[in-house]
Each structure stands twice: as C-alpha cells, then as structure tokens.
C-alpha cells in the first residue's frame, strides 16, 4: 500500500512507515496542487501538516484513499466533509503539542515578568544597562487562566509550582475539575478584576471572539500582564494595543494573531513591552517527533485493519460498520449540537436514550458522535470520537445511556437530555425517515416538531397568539433571509408555543435583536447544525 507524505513530518514518523511490511512511502514536500493531484491516484493514505491542502478535488482523484493523517491539531486544510462522503478517515494528533504549548505559554509569562528578550537585545547592541529592565516575581501573584482544558490544566500545574494563586474561568468547568487541579473557578469578570497575569486557552468561536476587549481592560488591574498562545482573535488586538500604550497593561506575550502572518508594520512590533513569537506553540523537537510518530502509527493502524484513533469524522469502528451506522452518527452529532445550543453552559448530566431499531445496533459510536456534537463548539481543544467521553469526564458531567424497551411513536428514536445542576432539562430527539435515511428533528424540549436536521435553525418559544408566524416571516424577510422549513407546536390553545424555523442564511444581529425583543417571544435561540 502506498502512503504519500505530502508535508515534512519527523524522520522518526517516516521511518516507522517505511518499516511496515507492504508499505511504500513517497515523500513529496512542497508539491504544487497540480503535482499532488497527479500523485494521489494510487495512494491509500496521505500524511500532512498544515501546508498541503487536501481538497474535494484531491479526494476525488484518489479512488484508493482510506485515510488522511494530520500531524498536528487543526484540520482546516482538509475537506473533512468530502472525506466523510467518500468514507475516508481523517485523523489528527491532538495530544502531541500539549506540553510544548504549555511551556511556551510559561516562557511568555516569564518574559513578561522579567524582560529578558529586551535585556538581551540591549546587551547585543553593546550596552550594559542594569536600570531599564527591572521586573516582577511570579511568586504570590494571581494567575487567571481563561479555558481550563488540556493545555490550561498543564499551565495551572506549572504556575502552582511557582507559588502562584490560580484562578480559572471556563463556562463548562465543573467544580470537581477545579478541585482536582486545586484552582479557584470564577467568572470572567472576577478573573479579570483579580488577576496579575492572564493567559487564554480557549478555541476561537463566535462566543470567544473578542471575549477580552476594551471593557475587560477597563476592569483589570493596572500593571496586568497578558498572554495568548491559543488562537488569535480571542483578545481584541486594538484594545490590547491601547491598554499597552496607556500603561494599564504592563506587558503582553503573543504567539497568535488575528491575521497571520503578522503584518510587517504592525504596531505590536514597535512596543518595548511586548514579546512576539511567530505561532511556535508546537515548535519543539519533542512535539514534532511526537505528532510525526503518532500520525504514522495511526495511519498504519487504519491500513492494517486496526483501531481508528483520533478520527475527526468517525468513531473507532471498522469500515463495514460505518456504512450501517453513518446516518445515525450524523443524526446523533446534530442532535448533540442542537441540545448544546439550547441548554445553559453548565450541565451536570447528559442523558441519551435509544428506542427501537437504533437500540439494536452498536450504540457506542453513536453515543460518542452525540458527545462530540455537543462539545465541538465549546471545547478548548479539538474534539473527536475518542476523546469526547474523556472531556465530559474532565468537565465533571455524567453521561447516562439507556436502551429503552418502552413503546415509541417512531420505528427508531434517539433522544438527548442536558440536565443542569438544579434539575432543569433541555432536550431534543430525532429519527431517520425514508429510504435515504434523512435525519429529522421530531422533539425539542418535549414539544412535537418536524424539521430537517441540517443547516441553520431559529428555535423560538413564544406566546400562542395570532400573527406570530407572520411577524417572524416579516422580520426575516426584511433581513433577506429565506425560510426553508418551519414547524409549529403547542400543548393547547393560548399556551406557550414552539416555532422551529430552518433558514437558508444566518440572520443579522439586527434581526436577531428584533426577534428577541418582541414582547411575545419568551426564548429565541439561533442554532447551527
């Protein structure tokens, strides 16, 4: 079997592949898209980093392709949807850069506390200046960690070794996780107000974009030191620049930026109290070796019929089972995403119940698909079918799975319930319809609905009164948003009603505010499946 190594991975990883019986390894670093297309015609696996783009066209040109392995975390350079349609496994290596990124974060923190780079530059210029580079100690200072996932947890351990008090903000942080790491779980506002140092370790999503902005810097201590080795855009760069120039923020360390590469004329380059690195989070010999060997081992496992590990588009199952389970995996992932977006941030339990035919299948992969769907928008790390249960456990969320023997109105039904610490339940259920196994949402929060499980949804709870359908249609029409599908539900006339509207495009912020502000609308959620 032929493996194309399209980007340079560690020599140890390539050597491992070459040692496997029956494997032919082709190294083609820096190839043009046209060259890649010509090379993939007879390959069974492709190994990449971030340079080579594995597009739909590339996947279509590779009829024998079984697996794409990404030596690293992000898979933005791989068309995962096209790969999934073809039954091609896409894998990443999420754990290989944890220590490297945590240590780089701490390097930035130390350089922010003691201006070593600036002092070194002064020495290199021939000076002997002992007065300009006074710093502060980490000992007994307060560190605020925004995002207590895998990397944030490692940073917390190192900070405690330096004698720091550690605060953590993570909207999905369970008290048990905070206790295990011996950190104080606080709100974001409390963290910003109390911290001497802040480091961010969140994914970049709609919710985390600019989560630290002008308002944050107004609330922070004078002399704050702040660091970002996660994703550009979590800290608003214009706000940080202003805070650095005013002296409100004493120092910053940045490894990631809103736009990369960082512009040559960026104002950050001119500030003496900023240390910049060019996205080096995973750039250690050990991390590169780790992800290179890990991706090589994972590719070999797939080609040799072994376990599928760290798949981003399917669970650890064999290819034959994927064909049967595929529609259920898709439905489960979408139901998980739906419930996450209608439920509060912190939950204590996730209950998954299967009725009918689906309960006769191997439900473990489906359960993992549901968990991944729930986590993928909110986790501070890449979520796949392997690590989703681990992340739930780390968050302190109990997952209960039940195969029900009671009767259901459907041949098969999958229901997900998110239970909050105070016992509130937020739920959705779905089934597969027709010969093509089309996924449908049939219940939301106990109300009967019927809408395709795809695309963009408005989930509305409103007073049951005349004109509501027209009102919503008018608002969306003004916003040039087309309605693709709609389902209405109520328990009785005049009670609270549910309206689920599937739309072709995302409503503007103005339209959303108008909907949420309508007197008859009790709850309005915009959901992306």
What residues fall within each predicted segment?
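NAD(P)-dependent dehydrogenase/reductase Rossmann-like domain
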Residues: 283-529
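Phosphate-coordination loops involved in phosphoryl transfer and adenosine-cofactor binding
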Residues: 65, 139-142, 214, 223
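An N-terminal-biased, well-structured beta-alpha scaffold segment characteristic
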Residues: 1-91, 213-215
């Amino acid at each position: 079997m032929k493996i194309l190594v399209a980007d340079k991975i560690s020599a140890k990883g390539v050597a491992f592949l070459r040692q496997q019986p029956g494997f032919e390894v082709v190294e083609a670093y820096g190839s043009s898209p046209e060259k890649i297309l010509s090379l993939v015609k007879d390959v069974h696996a492709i190994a990449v980093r971030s340079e080579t783009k594995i597009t739909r066209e590339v996947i279509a040109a590779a009829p024998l392709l079984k697996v794409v392995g990404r030596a690293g975390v992000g898979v933005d350079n791989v068309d995962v949807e096209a790969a999934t349609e073809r039954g091609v496994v896409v894998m990443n290596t999420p754990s290989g850069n944890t220590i490297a990124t945590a240590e780089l974060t701490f390097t930035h923190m130390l350089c922010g506390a003691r201006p070593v780079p600036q002092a070194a530059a002064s020495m290199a210029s021939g000076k002997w200046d002992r007065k300009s580079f006074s710093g502060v100690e980490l000992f007994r200072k307060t560190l605020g960690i925004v995002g207590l996932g895998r990397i944030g947890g490692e940073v917390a351990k190192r900070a405690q070794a330096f004698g720091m008090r550690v605060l953590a903000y993570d909207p999905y942080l369970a008290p048990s996780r905070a206790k295990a790491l011996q950190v104080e779980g606080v709100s974001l506002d409390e963290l910003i107000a109390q911290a001497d140092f802040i480091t961010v370790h969140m994914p970049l999503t709609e919710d985390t974009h600019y989560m630290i902005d002008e308002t944050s810097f107004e609330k922070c201590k004078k002399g704050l030191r702040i660091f970002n080795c996660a994703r550009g855009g979590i800290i608003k760069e214009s706000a940080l620049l202003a805070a650095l120039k005013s002296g409100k923020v004493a120092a910053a360390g940045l490894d990631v930026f809103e736009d990369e590469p960082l512009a040559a004329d960026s104002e950050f380059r001119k500030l003496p109290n900023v240390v910049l690195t060019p996205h080096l989070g995973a750039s250690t010999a050990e991390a590169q070796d780790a992800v290179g060997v890990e991706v090589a081992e994972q590719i070999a496992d797939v080609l040799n019929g072994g376990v599928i590990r760290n798949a981003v588009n399917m669970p650890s199952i064999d290819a034959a089972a994927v064909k049967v389970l595929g529609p259920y995996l898709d439905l489960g992932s979408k139901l998980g995403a739906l419930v996450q977006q209608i439920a509060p941030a912190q939950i204590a339990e996730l209950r998954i119940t299967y009725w009918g035919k689906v309960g006769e299948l191997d439900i473990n992969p489906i359960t993992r698909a549901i968990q991944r769907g729930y986590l993928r928008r909110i986790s501070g790390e890449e979520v796949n079918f392997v690590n989703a249960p681990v992340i739930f456990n780390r968050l302190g969320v109990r997952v209960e799975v039940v195969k029900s023997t009671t009767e259901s109105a459907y041949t098969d039904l999958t229901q997900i319930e998110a239970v909050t610490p105070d016992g509130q339940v937020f739920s959705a259920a779905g089934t597969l319809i027709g010969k093509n196994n089309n996924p449908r949402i049939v219940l939301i929060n106990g109300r009967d609905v019927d809408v395709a499980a795809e695309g963009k949804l408005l989930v509305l709870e409103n007073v049951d009164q005349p004109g509501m359908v027209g009102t919503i249609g008018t608002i969306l029409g003004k916003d040039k948003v087309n309605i693709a599908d709609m389902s209405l539900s109520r328990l009785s006339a005049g009670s609270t009603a549910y309206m689920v509207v599937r739309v072709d495009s995302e409503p503007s912020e103005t339209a959303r505010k108008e909907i949420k502000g309508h007197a008859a609308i009790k709850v309005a959620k915009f959901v992306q499946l």
